[in-house]
Amino acid sequence: MEEVRCPEHGTFCFLKTGVRDGPNKGKSFYVCRADTCSFVRATDIPVSHCLLHEDFVVELQGLLLPQDKKEYRLFFRCIRSKAEGKRWCGSIPWQDPDSKEHSVSNKSQHASETFHHSSNWLRNPFKVLDKNQEPALWKQLIKGEGEEKKADKKQREKGDQLFDQKKEQKPEMMEKDLSSGLVPKKKQSVVQEKKQEEGAEIQCEAETGGTHKRDFSEIKSQQCQGNELTRPSASSQEKSSGKSQDVQRESEPLREKVTQLLPQNVHSHNSISKPQKGGPLNKEYTNWEAKETKAKDGPSIQATQKSLPQGHFQERPETHSVPAPGGPAAQAAPAAPGLSLGEGREAATSSDDEEEDDVVFVSSKPGSPLLFDSTLDLETKENLQFPDRSVQRKVSPASGVSKKVEPSDPVARRVYLTTQLKQKKSTLASVNIQALPDKGQKLIKQIQELEEVLSGLTLSPEQGTNEKSNSQVPQQSHFTKTTTGPPHLVPPQPLPRRGTQPVGSLELKSACQVTAGGSSQCYRGHTNQDHVHAVWKITSEAIGQLHRSLESCPGETVVAEDPAGLKVPLLLHQKQALAWLLWRESQKPQGGILADDMGLGKTLTMIALILTQKNQEKKEEKEKSTALTWLSKDDSCDFTSHGTLIICPASLIHHWKNEVEKRVNSNKLRVYLYHGPNRDSRARVLSTYDIVITTYSLVAKEIPTNKQEAEIPGANLNVEGTSTPLLRIAWARIILDEAHNVKNPRVQTSIAVCKLQACARWAVTGTPIQNNLLDMYSLLKFLRCSPFDEFNLWRSQVDNGSKKGGERLSILTKSLLLRRTKDQLDSTGRPLVILPQRKFQLHHLKLSEDEETVYNVFFARSRSALQSYLKRHESRGNQSGRSPNNPFSRVALEFGSEEPRHSEAADSPRSSTVHILSQLLRLRQCCCHLSLLKSALDPMELKGEGLVLSLEEQLSALTLSELRDSEPSSTVSLNGTFFKMELFEGMRESTKISSLLAELEAIQRNSASQKSVIVSQWTNMLKVVALHLKKHGLTYATIDGSVNPKQRMDLVEAFNHSRGPQVMLISLLAGGVGLNLTGGNHLFLLDMHWNPSLEDQACDRIYRVGQQKDVVIHRFVCEGTVEEKILQLQEKKKDLAKQVLSGSGESVTKLTLADLRVLFGI
C-alpha cells in the first residue's frame, strides 16, 4: 500500500478493494477516511488475501499510527471480519515500498526484497513470495500436524545426530548462520480445550485437534525481513514424568546467538513442523530442532543470558507461562492496543482454555513485521534487568504473576511486573469479555494478583524515591456484596470503619491516579488507545455494584427504632430515613445524600443517626487502636475520633447546637462549636467530642487548596504540610449541612471539604441540583464515590447528555440519594407529614408609565448589546482556545457562555457575557424599584448571580452616573433620555411596593395574628421596603448578611412568638437556608431569581414541620418584562432537578444562549 493523502483533509487514505460482483470487483481504490469526502483515486494494486482467514479477500486497508508509537502500522480487514462486524483483522508494521533500509547480510537482503517489493508487483506483505517467485511455506507449515506428530519420534532421533554435527561446526559456519538474522525458538501446537475435559480426553484431543488454532504470527515471523528476524515465543511441554528446563546458550563473541527464556506452558505439546527441504529456513530450522533436543535430553542446565549490544534482542517480560502436564495448549497473541482484533477472539483467555496463559513475546526493534507489535518503550527497556539464572516453579494455572525469576532489584522488579500488568490490562480492555464463556474472570484474577504483588513492592522500604510515578498502579479488586437482608425493623449497625478502604469507595481505585507533583494519570493510562474501553469497563462495574447493593436496600415500610436518649419521638418518615442511613453506612461508599424536602426534619434525623451509632459503639466497646485501619496509607491523621464533624453555614451553627440540646438528653452528646477567634485548636481535645460544629468559611480558610485540585478525586488530594486540627483528625463521620454550598467543585470551599478524612460522609441538602449536573458531581466527589469522583470520567460517562449517561445517573441517585417531598404519599396513600394547605398566588402587575419608559431605555440598550455579542460569538465560534463545555464556566455563567476576560477594558458598551448579564440584572431591578439603579452593584449580590465584575465594570454597569454632577438638577439623563429626579427616590412608591402594601393591609384586616415574611435578593430593596413599612406603622425585623448568628437566632425566636414583629424581611441568600419562621404564614417574593431552588428554599422557611396555619406564597410578576421570560427558564431548571432526583434518567436540558434570545425576543 502506498502513502496517499487526501488533498482536502491531508490524512492517509484507506485502500478499498471491490469484492462484490460488478465492474469494480477486484479493483482497488484509495478513498478518504472522512465520510463526507468524495476523494477517490484508482490504483492497479492486485487483490490479496487475509493472513488470519487465508481464504478470504482483504477488502480494506489503512495506515494508522497507534498511540505512543512512532511508526505507522498497516491495518487490514477481510470480507469475513466485515461480515462479523469487526473493525480490523490485525496489523503489521508498515514501511514505504521505496525505502532502502535493508540488512547488510545476504540472506537478510533476500528477505527484505521479498517483503519490500514494489506495489505494482506485489500488494503488501500478505502473500510473501520467496526468492524463486514461489508461494511461501507458511501455508504448508500450518497444515498436516497429524503428520508432524507421526514423524515426531523420527525427528528427535535425527535431532541427536544434528546436535553432534552442530557441536563440531566451525565458528565461521556459525557466523554465517547468525547472519541470516534468525533466532531459533521452540514452537508449539495449539488446541482449544473445554473446561470440563480432563485426563484421557485431553490426551485424545491433543492427538487430533491442534491444527486449526496455530498462531499465524508464528509462521509469519519465519519469513520477516531485516537483520533481526524474530518469532513469537512459544513453549514446549514435557510429559508429566519428565522434568524440563529452559535453556539459553552462551556462545562466543563472534557467534552470539541468544535464545529466549521460555517458561513451560500448560498442556503445550512438543510437536515441530518441519519445513520442506530446500526451503529458505531449512538450516536455521535444523539448528532449532537440535537445540530443542538438547534441552529435552540434558539434565539441569544453567541458563544464562548475556547483555546484548544495541540491535540484538532483549527479553520482554510482558507475560508468562505456567508448566503443567497434559496435551497441547491454545495460545493467542494480544491485540494491538486500542483496536478490537476480532473482538479479541484470540487475544484473551477464557474458560475454554482456563489452564493456559499468555504468550511471552520476543520484541524486536520497530519495523519487525510481527503481526502485532508489542515492543516496550525505550525507557522501559533500558531499565530492565534480568537474572543470570532461570528457575522453573509450578504455580496455579490462573496465576497472573510471572513465575520466571524476576530482577532482585526493586526498581527493575517493579518495572518488570508493571509491564506485565499493562499488557494484561490492554488485553482486557480490547476484548469484549462478555462474549467469553468465563466473562474474563481468569484474566481479571491474573491482573489482581499482579496488583497485589505491586502493592507489596510499593510499601517496601527498599523502594527509592525516584520510583513513585511507577509504583502507582491502579488497584482493582472484586466487589463485595452486602447480603444482609433488611428486617422489618432495622437494628442500629456500627460504623464498619474497621478493615475497609476509603480510597476507591467501591473497592476500585479512582479512575485518576495522582502523582506527587499534582499531575494526573488516568486509570489504566491516558497513553493507550484502549483507555476508552478501560473507562467503560470500570464504570460498568461500579454501576453494577451500586445496582446490586439496592437488593439489600430497606423498603419503604422498614423503620428503625428511636435511639435511646432522644427526648422527642421520630416521625414515621424520619424512622424510615434512619433505617436508610444505617444501611448506607454499611455500603460502599459509606454515606450518601439526604435530600429530603426542606422542612421535613433532616437535622433531627441526622442527630438520631449520630446517637444511634454512639449507643452501638458503647455496647460493643470497640478498641480505639483499630479505628485507623480504614484509612489509606497516604492519610496523615494524628488522632482518631468517634465523633462527627458538622459543617454548615455560619447562620446555622447555633441552630445545630440548640437542636441537640433540645432534642437529646443532657450529657448524652458532647458538642463543641469550632468557631470564633477564641476557638480551641488542639486536635487532641477536639477528637474527644461527640459533635464538632464549624462553618464552610472557616474550613476554606484553614485548609490550603489550589485550583489544580478541582478535578482530582478527593482520595488523592494532598493533605500534607498543614497544621489545622480538622485535617489532623480522622472523623467517624462528616456531615455537610446545606451541602449545595459546595456545588461548584472549583471553589476553595469545595476542595477543602473533600480533603477531610472520615469513615462516613453525608451531604444534607434540600436542593442537591440547582443549576446543572455538575452540582451532583461535586457531591459525589465529596462522598469519594469512585470512579465518578474523577471529573473527566464523570463528563464522559454520566454528564454527556446520552441515554446511557442518564441511566447511570439514575442508578447513582437511586443508590446514594434519599429524597422525599412534603406532598409525597406513603404506601397507605397518606402524606408523609401532615401539613396545612399551601397556596401559590401570582400577582400580575403593570408598570406605571414612567417606570415602563425607563425600562424600555434599558431594554433597548441591553438588546443591542446582546445582538452585537451574538454576532461576534457566532462568527468566532470556539476559536478562543477554551473548551465551550467547560463546566465551571457553565456554573459561573448559567447560560453556558464564555468567562469574562478581566484584562479587557470596559468598552462603551462592552458586549461581554458578564456585561449582558449585569444588564439583565438592572432590568429586573427596574421592575422592583427605580431607586436601585442609583447604587453600584453589590459584590455579594453579584456573587449570588454568578457574576464577577471588575471595579471599573461595577462603576459603569449602567448606574445613573449623571446624578453625581455637581450642579443641582431636577432631571437626569439616561442614554439620551431625560427623566424626573423624583422617579429614583426611595420614598416613591413603585408598582410592586404599592401592591405589597395593599396585600399586607388586607392580611391585617382579616386576622391580626397572621404574620408575613418578605424576601428579596437585594438588600437595598429590603431597605426601601422597610421605609414604607415604617411609614404605614407596621413592625418589622431584618435578617441579612450583616446580622451575626447569635442575633439571627434571637430575631427568629422573637418572630415566632405571638408578640414579635408583624413582618420579617430576609435576603434571599442570607436568610434562605436553615431558618425556621413558622410564626409567619404569608411569604412575599418581590423579585425573580434565575435559580428557582433558592426561591423554594425561602418558601420552606414557613412551610415546614411545625406550621399550624394555612400558607400563602405571593409572587409578583410585571407584565411585558423579562420577569415573564424568567418564569419559563425557572420551569426548565425545575424539570432538570426533578428528572435527576426522581432517577428518571431522561435527557437533561441545559440553558444556552438560546435562552438569552428568548429573554430579549431576538
From Swiss-Prot:
Domain Helicase C-terminal: 995-1157
Residue span(s) of domain Helicase ATP-binding: 583-786
Annotated InterPro entries: DNA/RNA_helicase_DEAH_CS, Helicase_ATP-bd, Helicase_C-like, P-loop_NTPase, SNF2-like_sf, SNF2/RAD54-like_C, SNF2_N, SNF2_RAD54_helicase_TF
Cellular component terms (Gene Ontology): cytosol; nucleus; spliceosomal complex; transcription elongation factor complex
Annotated residues for binding of ATP: 596-603
Biased segments, Polar residues type: 105-116, 219-232, 261-274, 459-485, 877-888
Pfam families membership: Helicase_C, SNF2-rel_dom, Zn_ribbon_GRF
UniProt crosslink position (Glycyl lysine isopeptide (Lys-Gly) (interchain with G-Cter in SUMO2)): 143
CDD domains: DEXHc_TTF2 (cd18072), SF2_C_SNF (cd18793)
PTM sites of type Phosphoserine: 460, 883, 908
Ranges of biased composition (kind: Low complexity): 233-245, 323-338
Compartment list: Cytoplasm; Nucleus
RNA-binding is among the record's keywords: no
Sites where the protein binds Zn(2+): 6, 9, 32, 37
Keywords: ATP-binding, Cytoplasm, DNA-binding, Helicase, Hydrolase, Isopeptide bond, Metal-binding, mRNA processing, mRNA splicing, Nucleotide-binding, Nucleus, Phosphoprotein, Spliceosome, Transcription, Transcription regulation, Transcription termination, Ubl conjugation, Zinc, Zinc-finger
Homology family: Belongs to the SNF2/RAD54 helicase family.
Subunit structure: Interacts with CDC5L. Part of the spliceosome.
Purpose of the protein: DsDNA-dependent ATPase which acts as a transcription termination factor by coupling ATP hydrolysis with removal of RNA polymerase II from the DNA template. May contribute to mitotic transcription repression. May also be involved in pre-mRNA splicing.
UniProt name for this protein: Transcription termination factor 2
Organism: Homo sapiens
Encoding gene (name): TTF2
